[in-house]
From Swiss-Prot:
Record-stated family: In the N-terminal section; belongs to the histidinol-phosphatase family. In the C-terminal section; belongs to the imidazoleglycerol-phosphate dehydratase family.
Compartment(s): Cytoplasm
PROSITE patterns: IGP_DEHYDRATASE_1, IGP_DEHYDRATASE_2
Protein's recorded name: Histidine biosynthesis bifunctional protein HisB
Annotated stretches, region: Imidazoleglycerol-phosphate dehydratase: 169-357
Primary localization class, coarse: cytoplasm
MF term (GO), any: imidazoleglycerol-phosphate dehydratase activity
Keyword Ribonucleoprotein: no
Binding site for Zn(2+): 95, 97, 103, 105
Residues forming the catalytic site: 11 (nucleophile), 13 (proton donor)
Alphabetically ordered keywords of this record: Amino-acid biosynthesis, Cytoplasm, Histidine biosynthesis, Hydrolase, Lyase, Magnesium, Metal-binding, Multifunctional enzyme, Zinc
Length: 357
């Protein structure tokens, strides 16, 4: 095992398998029962890059009160079931002592996991102890990692999987210059509740088109030097929005990455997008008017160029039609619809053969 791995140190009885409520020993095959959804959850956690280590106290294992052969039959069956379904444990760490023995390996003491800690194998920010007892949480504290208390009703395997693999894709960017004061918030996994105020009514409407057709939430508050013109307001808003989208995407693991969309309204709007990590814009649209509403038409291409710079994406965007209002709107709608495809989470893999985006 390489250094600094994401490791889940998982309790056995009451967490992976049901703990008998009377004698607390799984010492016969007919007492073996898996906890709900444990196998599909562990498989998904493995796919997300977690290594699995079982850590369990087995009171008096190997004594008359708990003969080794009584333990082995159901335990080996459990391991065979896990392995047959693709669940692989790097280690199975067992303390066989009674609490009164005052050994160094019984949870929550560190004896069982000492090698992992001393060898630098644990990614302390992204490793967890999962178990149903307070001693499991104490073990986590002693290891200086986080603990999750398993409960089939309130914190079952489905919820644990969600908590460990679904990270909130949100970001807030504050950008302040001599010309503008901007705050942009995006939540890529929520829709509705958009609140956009730039001082430019038509521009507000266009930004709302991106969020609405992109399927995400945007809150954008801008104060700019509109007494001069709209240049700084549009440019800096694009820079802040692109940065917010990039930060919300994180490492881009699991996203679609690519998107393509056409047409929009009566205009033929075409958009192709790659969240490649490399800024590039190819833009093709002609306007017959200098302004639509309070937005300068020359700022449309400048908006998308600034956005691609901070989002770090490759964008091909074009539209043709007879009405400038509809042409501009089709560009923003097409971009939003294409972005929706590209940011959608489809799995857990990074969509790049290079291993980084």
């Amino acid at each position: 095992m390489s250094k600094q791995q994401k490791i889940l140190f998982i309790d056995r009885d009451g967490t992976l398998i049901v703990e008998p409520p009377v004698d607390f020993q799984v010492d016969r095959l007919d007492k073996l029962k898996l906890e709900p959804f444990v196998i599909p959850s562990l498989l998904s956690l493995q796919d997300a890059g977690y290594r699995l280590v079982m850590v369990t106290n087995q009171d008096g294992l190997g004594t008359d009160s708990y003969p080794q052969e009584d333990f082995d039959a159901p335990h080996n069956m459990m391991m065979e079931i896990f392995e047959s379904q693709g669940v692989k444990f790097d280690d199975v760490l067992i303390c066989p002592h009674f609490e009164k023995d005052n050994c160094s390996c019984r949870k929550p003491k560190l004896g069982l996991v000492k090698e992992y800690l001393q060898a630098g194998k644990v990614d302390f920010q992204n490793s967890f102890v999962i178990g149903d007892r307070q001693t499991d949480l104490q073990l986590a504290e002693n290891m200086a990692i986080r603990g999750i208390q398993y409960n089939p009703e309130t914190m079952g395997w489905k919820q644990i999987l969600k908590d460990l693999t679904v990270k909130a894709r949100v970001a807030e960017v504050v950008r302040t210059t001599k010309e503008t004061d901007i705050k942009v918030f995006v939540n890529l996994d929520e829709q509705g509740g958009n609140a956009i105020s730039t001082g430019l009514g038509f521009f507000d409407h266009m930004l709302d088109q991106i969020a609405t057709h992109g399927g995400f939430q945007m809150v954008c508050k801008v104060e700019g030097d509109l007494h001069i013109d709209d240049h700084h307001t549009v440019e800096d808003t694009a820079l802040a929005l692109g940065q917010a989208l990039k930060e919300a995407l994180g490492d881009k693991r699991g996203i679609g990455r690519f998107g393509f969309s056409l047409p929009m309204d009566e205009c033929l709007a075409q958009c192709a997008l790659d969240l490649s990590g490399r800024p590039y814009l190819k833009f093709d649209a002609q306007f017959s008017r200098e302004q639509v509403g309070d937005l300068s038409t020359e700022m449309v291409v400048h908006f998308f160029r600034s956005l691609t710079d901070t989002l770090a994406c490759t964008l091909h965007l074009s539209s043709a039609g007879n009405n400038d209002h509809h042409i501009i709107e089709s560009l923003f709608k097409a971009f939003g619809r294409t972005l929706r495809q590209a940011i959608k989470v489809e799995g857990t893999e990074l969509p790049s053969s290079k291993g980084v985006l």
